[in-house]
Swiss-Prot record:
Basic and acidic residues composition bias: residue spans: 17-44
Basic residues biased stretches: 1-16
GO terms for MF: structural constituent of ribosome
Coiled coil: none
Region (Disordered): 1-60
Name of the featured protein: Large ribosomal subunit protein bL32
UniProt superkingdom: Bacteria
Gene (name only): rpmF
GO cellular component, one term: large ribosomal subunit
GO biological process: translation
């Protein structure tokens, strides 16, 4: 059976667990509409992504 050779230090254990934390999502302000959106995602109101129209605009 595999057994660790050395005890894991609290510092190393904490560094390993730091990736498990829940991080809040980041938002950026859209240049054209001023709406908040996720980075690298399209704007659902305008249907634009990277300056191109990829979806038809929603009619309100």
């Amino acid at each position: 059976m595999a057994v660790p050779r050395r005890k894991t230090s609290p510092s190393r254990r904490g560094m390993r667990r730091s990736a498990d934390a829940i991080k809040k999502p980041t938002y950026v302000e859209d240049k054209d509409s001023g709406e908040l959106r996720r980075p690298h995602h399209l704007d659902l109101k305008t249907g634009m992504y990277k300056g191109r129209q990829v979806l038809k605009k929603k009619d309100a």
